[in-house]
């Protein structure tokens, strides 16, 4: 019976095939992997066989040493790498341990500093409360003793907080004894400390003598420092370092004997050579030994070269074998295997290198951290040391204050001074224990504490402190009050040395002074800070006010002279009663020079403009009239700034200040009036140039009115001097005579100008002859004015000063004469230039008229022709 295969049977067959395939695929992969492993093993077997054949061929016994040497070098290299890694790991571990220990120590030191700061602040507050009590009865008797005992207890607590941990147990007994002695207050603290400090020194000396086996005793007076003792016997070096750590109370000393690494003891090696032959045989042996010693390095070098050649040959043979095997076993099939091996090796090397770099970076970071922590530890240890020293000194001071030798000194002013010294030591301690970033926060507290201490101290110290702590606002108010004061003061008050330098909107002043009416060193300095060379000037030394003013005048431009000339300076070598007068005349001389320069500059600008604009005289004069007030305003501002100098005079110069003020006003008014007269004349000439005689007559009629006003001002000047008291009698007469001569000179100048104008108004028909006559007559007229000017010094020199204080007035007169002479010269120069221009213009007009006449003569003749 035959059964035909149906669809169900075919489907089952397909499912079976798929299942079989799925089962056989892992087996196929496994077989492939086994085949690759077999290939690798075969390859290695062939390589081993090749090496064995080569070794047999090249006599393996000869190459055995070379193979061992190569293997030994490779092993040594691996061991060195491993040792280096272990060394780095150990060093890293040590640094980690060191960092953690330093962190713990830093935390402890910071905590100790914080506790010390709190204790020092509480002690400072306690001392401040003790120094400035609310009820004065509590500062005497038993209450004072109890409060001082509390202060000593706080100071001891502070010393305990600042002491290291290893000294706390050692200081407990000493502190208990000190507490008992403080309460009993039987003996001074200094004597007790001297007795306590002798005992550990003697024990230390005995210990040092026992340890070092020294033959002589040490000097007990010398301080104990780090002692280093070295014994040398038969080339044996042993070192002991005796480290003395003194306790913070100065009463206990500890000895730490630390071993210092050095060479171990070893017996002396003695080599004896017994000669058995004559001397010649010994010499021959010595020569042979020397030759052998010389040839040994050469032999070793040759052996090394031979080994290197063998290695190169062996490597070449292995490379040749690998190339043949790759060709034999189809290099393409083994290519993936070789690449994977090389890739794994490279990856392994990169991982090793990355790990080494990571360890090196971590080690570097730890080193940096260790160094920074070492620096911080050094700073904190130094701060703790300074704090301990300050706390000890404060403790000793309080102990001495609590147990005085003389009971009378513990009351009254001496007690206050001692308490103030204790407060100062406490403040110094707080400052030492405060970190650098907390210094700014503690400044306000220190200032308040200093004010409290100074209030309770002597009046002299309080006055000095107030003068040092005056702010800039109060300084400016003081300067304004001094400069604006006009009321009379007592002239019998002693004159102090005063150095004041004013600068507009550029002065940032600092007041330094001391209240002393007898010493010459009590002075008020107002020092400018706006210059960039202040530090260099301070290094060079103090600069005199005169030199300072001259340097400022050189640097300041022309427009800022009004600031520089308002400076009041006083030489330090003059007397106090004479300084105020000399400073006043010094500034007055500078104002006169400034005014003369301004007038000369104004005249010179006027002459230049007339030269440039000779073709349009009316237009040029109108422009000049418009521009003149600006130029004159500058000079007038400088002139009117002169009286501000007189406000800085001292009390004894108060009567003269008003007189100089009036005189300066009259002189400025006269100068302004003369400028107005000249401008008025120029305007009249411009308005009507065709009729000069009529305009000049009108001007002559109007001039007396204007001049009368100026003369009234001038003659009203001496009235200001009549108000001077009897103290200024000699100065009043001198100034009065000077004013009369000054007015006479002004009248002479006006009369000369009038005569010149009258001669010009006559208008002679021949201009050439008139010019020659003018040149002849003019020197006589000017000679008259010069005679008047030259007579003034004779009159002034005849007035001898009645007292030394009249010398400044004589200087002022001479400067006034110099100013007048300069003014007259400038006027003559301007007038001569103006007349020359007028002559040139007249010549040009005459030539034009002649040309017109010639043209008119030729014109009728040509018409007739």
From Swiss-Prot:
UniProt KW keywords: Coiled coil, Cytoplasm, Repeat
- Gene Ontology CC annotation, any one: cytoplasm
Tissue spec: Expressed in spinal cord.
- The UniProt gene name for this protein comes to NBPF11
Show where the Olduvai domain sits.
Answer: 165-259, 436-528, 529-617, 620-675, 676-767, 770-865
User: Which InterPro entries does the annotation name?
Assistant: NBPF (IPR055306), Olduvai_dom (IPR010630)
- Keyword Mitochondrion applies: no
Q: Which PANTHER family match?
A: NEUROBLASTOMA BREAKPOINT FAMILY MEMBER 1-RELATED (PTHR14199:SF35), NEUROBLASTOMA BREAKPOINT FAMILY MEMBER 6-LIKE PROTEIN (PTHR14199)
- In its UniProt entry, what is this protein called? NBPF family member NBPF11
Give its localization.
Cytoplasm
């Amino acid at each position: 019976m035959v059964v035909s295969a149906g669809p169900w049977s075919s489907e089952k067959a397909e499912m079976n095939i798929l299942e079989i395939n799925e089962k056989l695929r892992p087996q196929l992969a496994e077989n492939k992997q086994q085949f690759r492993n077999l290939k690798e093993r075969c390859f290695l077997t062939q390589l081993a066989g090749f090496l064995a054949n080569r070794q047999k061929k090249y006599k393996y016994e000869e190459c055995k040493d070379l193979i061992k040497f190569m293997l030994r070098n490779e092993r040594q290299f691996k061991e060195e790498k491993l040792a280096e890694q272990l060394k780095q790991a150990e060093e890293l571990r040590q640094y980690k341990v060191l960092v953690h220990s330093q962190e713990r120590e830093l935390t402890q030191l910071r905590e100790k500093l914080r506790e010390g700061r709190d204790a020092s602040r509480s002690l400072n507050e306690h001392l401040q409360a003790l120094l400035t009590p609310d009820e004065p009865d509590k500062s005497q008797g038993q209450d004072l003793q109890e409060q001082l005992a509390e202060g000593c207890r706080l100071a001891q607590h502070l010393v305990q907080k600042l002491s290291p941990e290893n000294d706390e147990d050692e200081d407990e007994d000493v502190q208990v004894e000190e507490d008992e002695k403080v309460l009993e207050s039987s003996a001074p603290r200094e004597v007790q400390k001297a007795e306590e400090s002798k005992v550990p020194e003697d024990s230390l000396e005995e210990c040092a003598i026992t340890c070092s086996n020294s033959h002589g005793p040490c000097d007990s007076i010398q301080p104990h420092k780090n002692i280093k003792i070295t014994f040398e016997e038969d080339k044996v070096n042993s070192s002991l370092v005796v480290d003395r750590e003194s306790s913070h109370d100065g009463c206990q000393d500890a000895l730490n004997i630390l071993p210092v690494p050095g060479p171990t003891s070893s017996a002396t090696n003695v080599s004896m050579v017994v000669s058995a032959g004559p001397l010649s045989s010994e010499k021959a042996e010595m020569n042979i030994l020397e030759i052998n010693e010389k040839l040994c390095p050469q032999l070793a070098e040759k052996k090394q070269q031979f080994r290197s050649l063998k290695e190169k040959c062996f490597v070449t043979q292995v490379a040749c074998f690998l190339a043949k095997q790759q060709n034999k076993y189809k290099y393409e099939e083994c290519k993936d295997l070789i690449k994977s091996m090389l890739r794994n090796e490279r990856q392994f090397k990169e991982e090793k290198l990355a790990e080494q770099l990571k360890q090196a970076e971590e080690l570097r970071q730890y080193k940096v951290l260790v160094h920074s922590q070492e620096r911080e530890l050094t700073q904190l240890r130094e701060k703790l040391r300074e704090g301990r020293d300050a706390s000890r000194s404060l403790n000793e001071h309080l102990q001495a204050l609590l147990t005085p030798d003389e009971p009378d000194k513990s009351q009254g002013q001496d007690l206050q001074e001692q308490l103030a010294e204790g407060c100062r030591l406490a403040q110094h301690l707080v400052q030492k224990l405060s970190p650098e970033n907390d210094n700014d926060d503690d400044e306000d507290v220190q200032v308040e504490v200093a004010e409290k201490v100074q209030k309770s101290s002597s009046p002299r110290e309080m006055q000095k402190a107030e003068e040092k702590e005056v702010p800039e606002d109060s300084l400016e108010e003081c300067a304004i009050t001094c400069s604006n004061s006009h009321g009379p003061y007592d002239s019998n008050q002693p004159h102090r040395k005063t150095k004041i330098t004013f600068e507009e909107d550029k002065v940032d002043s600092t007041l330094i002074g001391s209240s002393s009416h007898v010493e010459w060193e009590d002075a008020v300095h107002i020092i400018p800070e706006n210059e960039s060379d202040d530090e260099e000037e301070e290094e060079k030394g103090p600069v005199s006010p005169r030199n300072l003013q001259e340097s400022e005048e050189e640097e300041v431009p022309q427009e800022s002279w009004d600031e520089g000339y308002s400076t009041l300076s006083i030489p330090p070598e003059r007397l106090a009663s004479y300084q105020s007068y000399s400073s006043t005349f010094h500034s007055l001389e500078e104002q006169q020079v400034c005014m003369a320069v301004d007038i000369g500059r104004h005249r010179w600008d006027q002459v230049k403009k007339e030269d440039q604009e000779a073709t349009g005289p009316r237009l040029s004069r109108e422009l000049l009239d418009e521009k003149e007030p600006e130029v004159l305003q500058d000079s007038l501002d400088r002139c009117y700034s002169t009286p501000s100098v007189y406000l800085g005079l001292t009390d004894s110069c108060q009567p003269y200040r008003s007189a100089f003020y009036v005189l300066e006003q009259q002189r400025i008014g006269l100068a302004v009036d003369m400028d107005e007269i000249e401008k008025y004349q120029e305007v009249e000439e411009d308005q009507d140039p065709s009729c000069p005689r009529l305009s000049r007559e009108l001007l002559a009629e109007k001039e007396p009115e204007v001049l009368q006003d100026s003369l009234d001002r001038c003659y009203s000047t001496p009235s200001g001097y009549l108000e001077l008291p009897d103290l200024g009698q000699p100065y009043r007469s001198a100034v009065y005579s000077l004013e009369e001569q000054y007015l006479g000179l002004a009248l002479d100048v006006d009369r000369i100008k009038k005569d010149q104008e009258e001669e010009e108004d006559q208008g002679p028909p021949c201009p050439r002859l008139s010019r020659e006559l003018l040149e002849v007559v003019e020197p006589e007229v000017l000679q008259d004015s010069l005679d008047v000017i030259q007579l003034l010094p004779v009159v002034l020199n005849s007035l001898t000063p009645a007292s030394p204080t009249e010398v400044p007035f004589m200087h002022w007169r001479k400067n006034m004469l110099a100013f007048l002479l300069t003014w007259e010269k400038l006027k003559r120069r301007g007038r001569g230039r103006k007349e020359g221009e007028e002559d040139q213009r007249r010549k040009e007009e005459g030539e034009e008229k002649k040309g017109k006449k010639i043209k008119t003569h030729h014109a009728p003749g040509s018409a007739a022709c």
